[in-house]
């Protein structure tokens, strides 16, 4: 997939490791349990499991502050 960094309009390519449903997140870097999850420059939660680059990030491995 083509990823665009909105703050500086740069871009890069990333391969998703699986089909990622709409509304779910894709790990842009390797994430380990305990890491902070950032979305649109905001801290939205903590990882409770690992995700590799291109991995699926959702409730199975991320505990959001929202819930």
Swiss-Prot record:
Subcellular localization: Cytoplasm
Function: Together with SuyB, desulfonates sulfolactate to pyruvate and sulfite.
Protein name from the UniProt record: (2R)-sulfolactate sulfo-lyase subunit alpha
Any one GO CC term of the record: cytoplasm
Organism: Paracoccus pantotrophus
Broad class of where this protein is predominantly found: cytoplasm
Lineage summary: Bacteria, Pseudomonadati, Pseudomonadota, Alphaproteobacteria, Rhodobacterales
Keyword terms: Cytoplasm, Lyase
EC number: 4.4.1.24
Encoding gene, per UniProt annotation: suyA
Complexes and interactors: (2R)-sulfolactate sulfo-lyase is composed of a SuyA and a SuyB subunit.
Keyword flag Lyase: yes
GO molecular function, one term: sulfolactate sulfo-lyase activity
